[in-house]
């Protein structure tokens, strides 16, 4: 177990008083309700950290009151009276004694802005709980008056702004005083105790709904939003709400088109760091997701799940027009192009009709469902992009040759033809290609792999296009039996 090692000096015993903060009744009454709630949360979290590390024997009386939801009241006053010598020290004396001001004290002091009082250091001569203050250590007045004699005390009494500036400054030396056995140093015991939970693996904060435990109370509060379905962070552009501010910040990049995460290898930029990490696996060749049936590995878990359907025979994608089922969604999209072409020739499916149907969802339907094929989408923007497959709309046109595309990514890929860029090179023979999947097809020439097999004669092919061309020998058109092209029995 990691122990607290003060720097410098011998090892100190950690008790609740090291991380506790006490107030007088006057100070407590100056706090707003949200500040009092902050005090309760921090005290309970500090106690939980100590308990998880095994430093506590008996539960402090302050914690018992806070757990019951009662006001600390008289207990705070009693502790303050017992600690009047500490509370009466001026700022210089506190620095000499090595008394460190906690972050909670500074935060509450800045929020409260108590005039004439440095937090935990009353104006000299101010009675605490009816008890007179002891003689001033710097030769201050002994007549019981509450006039400040400290050089900065008069400024504090006159200007709350100067007080807040002082409260924002660390008291004492800025060097860390507590060091963990792992080498990391902290200025406060409470921060060290929170860090030590990493080494112990303790998770003292448990969710009452599902039983899941967490290392910090802040993470527990964030988790509990899942059960309450509360989404306090709302986008000002589209109104979509999120549970976390980080999710909202990532969502904003959809509207601003900002892509701050760039790949160091190829320069491609992404709006989220997770997508950049996923992309970098293509350069490193890392394939962490392996199939338990055949051992084949993949870069993405989604691709592994698709591959698993080859072994299980599952075909979750069904065409609503003809009932044909497919393993992959991409196969279904290719199949729908046949229906879209037929509908365009008959005048039955047009862009306006599809968009109108998409904007008129029926009762009980998902909010974003394709009116032609029934495929659901989480966002309306994805549905509109998908509808171009049915309408044949191609808004992205090449400035060089005038060829149009339904997606900007396809246009970018096409433009490599004009720039003659071929970023994907074979490591065996050095031949380069514009597309990664063309390189993968080329690799089969070296490996001898032929995954596409004809059902009629059993002939295997290394490319899908070669198999489609071969099927014409048996009297099949390329558009027929689209499902069979990627069926499990076709793979060798």
UniProtKB/Swiss-Prot annotation:
Residues 139-168, 474-486 have a biased composition (Basic and acidic residues). Keywords: DNA-binding, Metal-binding, Nucleus, Repeat, Transcription, Transcription regulation, Zinc, Zinc-finger. One of its GO terms (cellular component) is nucleus. Residues 14-85 form the KRAB domain. Belongs to the krueppel C2H2-type zinc-finger protein family. PROSITE patterns: KRAB (PS50805), ZINC_FINGER_C2H2_1 (PS00028), ZINC_FINGER_C2H2_2 (PS50157). SUPFAM superfamilies: beta-beta-alpha zinc fingers, KRAB domain (Kruppel-associated box). It comes from Homo sapiens (Human). GO terms for biological process: regulation of transcription by RNA polymerase II. Residues 129-170, 472-492 are annotated as: Disordered. This is Zinc finger protein 517. It comes from the Eukaryota. The gene is ZNF517. One of its GO terms (molecular function) is zinc ion binding. It is found in: Nucleus. The keyword Transcription regulation applies. May be involved in transcriptional regulation. A zinc finger (C2H2-type) spans 178-199, 205-227, 233-255, 261-283, 289-311, 317-339, 368-390, 396-418, 424-446, 452-474. InterPro entries: C2H2-ZF_domain, KRAB, KRAB_dom_sf, Znf_C2H2_sf, Znf_C2H2_type. Pfam families: KRAB, zf-C2H2. Transmembrane segments: none annotated.
């Amino acid at each position: 177990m990691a122990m607290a090692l003060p720097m410098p000096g011998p090892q100190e015993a950690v008790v609740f008083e090291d991380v506790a903060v006490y107030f007088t009744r006057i100070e407590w009454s100056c706090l707003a309700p949200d500040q009092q709630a902050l005090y309760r949360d921090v005290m309970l979290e500090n106690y939980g950290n100590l308990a998880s590390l095994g430093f506590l024997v008996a539960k402090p009386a302050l914690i018992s009151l806070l757990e019951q939801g009662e006001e600390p009241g008289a207990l705070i006053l009693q502790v303050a009276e017992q600690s009047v010598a500490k509370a009466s020290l001026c700022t210089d004396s506190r620095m000499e004694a090595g008394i460190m001001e906690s972050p909670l004290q500074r935060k509450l002091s800045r929020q409260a802005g108590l005039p004439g009082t440095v937090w935990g250091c009353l104006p000299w001569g101010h009675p605490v709980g009816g008890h007179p203050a002891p003689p001033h250590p710097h030769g201050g007045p002994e007549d019981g008056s509450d006039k400040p004699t400290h050089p900065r005390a008069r400024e504090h009494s006159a200007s709350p702004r100067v007080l807040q500036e002082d409260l924002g400054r660390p008291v004492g030396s800025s060097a860390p005083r507590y060091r963990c056995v792992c080498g990391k140093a902290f200025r406060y015991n409470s921060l060290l105790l929170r860090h030590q939970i990493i080494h112990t693996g303790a998770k003292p904060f448990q969710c009452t709904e599902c039983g899941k435990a967490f290392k910090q109370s802040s993470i527990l509060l964030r988790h509990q939003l899942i059960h309450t379905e509360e989404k306090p962070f709302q986008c000002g552009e589209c109104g979509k709400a999120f549970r976390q501010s980080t999710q909202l910040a990532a969502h904003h990049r959809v509207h601003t088109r900002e892509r701050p995460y760039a790949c160091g290898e190829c320069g491609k930029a992404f709006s989220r760091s997770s997508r950049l990490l996923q992309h970098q696996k293509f350069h490193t060749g890392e394939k962490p997701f392996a199939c338990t049936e055949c051992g084949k590995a993949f870069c993405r878990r989604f691709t592994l799940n698709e591959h698993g359907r080859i072994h299980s025979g599952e075909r979750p994608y069904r065409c609503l027009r003809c009932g044909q089922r497919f393993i992959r969604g991409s196969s279904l999209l290719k199949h729908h192009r046949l229906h879209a072409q037929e509908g365009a020739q008959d005048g039955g499916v047009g862009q306006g009709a599809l968009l109108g149907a998409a904007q008129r969802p029926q009762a009980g339907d998902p909010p974003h469902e394709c009116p032609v094929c029934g495929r659901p989408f989480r966002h309306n923007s994805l549905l509109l992009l998908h509808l171009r497959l049915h309408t044949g709309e191609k808004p992205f046109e090449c400035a060089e040759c005038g060829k149009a595309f339904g997606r900007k990514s396809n246009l970018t890929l096409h433009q490599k033809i004009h720039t003659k860029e071929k970023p994907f090179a074979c490591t065996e023979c050095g031949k380069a290609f514009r597309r990664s999947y063309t390189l993968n097809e080329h690799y089969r020439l070296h490996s001898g792999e032929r995954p596409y097999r004809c059902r009629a004669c059993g002939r295997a092919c290394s490319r899908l296009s070669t198999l489609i061309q071969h099927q014409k020998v048996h009297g099949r058109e390329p558009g027929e039996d689209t499902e069979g092209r990627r069926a499990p029995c076709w793979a060798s």
